[in-house]
Design a protein with these regions (language model features):
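A late C-terminal transmembrane helix in Major Facilitator Superfamily
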Residues: 94, 107-142
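Multi-pass alpha-helical transporter architecture, strongest
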Residues: 153-176
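Transmembrane alpha-helical cores of Major Facilitator Superfamily
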Residues: 32-36, 63, 118-126
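C-terminal transmembrane helical hairpin of 12-TM major facilitator-type secondary transporters
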Residues: 26, 33-38, 44, 49-103
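Extracytoplasmic gate region of multi-pass secondary transporters
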Residues: 1-45, 131
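Intracellular helix-loop hinge segments at the cytoplasmic ends of transmembrane helices
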Residues: 9, 13, 98-107
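Interfacial helix-cap and linker-helix signal at transmembrane-aqueous boundaries
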Residues: 15-19, 48-49, 134-143
Length: 176
């Protein structure tokens, strides 16, 4: 969901392809904002995950990403909107990591934590690959990223919904 969205704010000139003709410095500042916001968002999510339902926080993060991405692509793109998008999306980007790992540990214990989280991480890498690959294919077909951005919005909404049925209570009779 996130990986295919990075292309339009990279420092490689892709901002120009969506109509922003400022220098590549905007891309560099955008990436920096994403990184800074990542730190704040990830620490905050971990803190919140110790106090509130992880599944609802994850659903909220994916919903937030979906809303932010939708707003970004339906409003006029300006240097300011790129920076705002970068800060907001950056705050949610890796915020899922402490919540997902915490949820796995809570549900399945820590005995197989490395294996289970490794599988989750691997599945995210597959999704990242297919998101970027599909984004490139769709750009070749249509000449812009609009279609893949809408697909990303759909994936974000689906990600929010699939977290809701998670049962956060552990069956302690199961060995861990």
């Amino acid at each position: 969901f996130i990986t295919e969205m990075c292309g339009p704010i990279a420092t490689t000139g892709l901002l120009h392809s969506i109509g922003i003709t400022t220098t590549s410095a905007l891309g560099a500042v955008a990436i920096s904002l994403i990184g800074l916001a990542n730190i704040i968002g990830t620490i905050s999510a971990g803190w919140l995950g110790n106090r509130y339902s992880k599944k609802y926080l994850l659903a909220g993060i994916y919903t937030g990403r979906t809303i932010i991405l939708t707003a970004f692509i339906v409003t006029p793109m300006t240097p300011e909107s790129v920076l705002l998008f970068s800060a907001l999306m950056g705050s949610l980007w890796l915020a899922t990591v402490p919540l997902t790992s915490g949820l796995i540990a809570h549900l399945y214990g820590v005995r197989f934590m490395g294996t289970l989280y490794g599988l989750v991480f691997f599945s995210h890498q597959l999704g990242a690959f297919f998101g970027v690959w599909l984004g490139g294919r769709m750009y070749d077909l249509y000449g812009d990223y609009t279609a893949i951005w809408w697909i990303g919005i759909g994936v974000g909404a689906l990600s929010a919904v699939v977290h809701l049925p998670i049962q956060e209570t552990r069956n302690d009779a199961t060995p861990t």
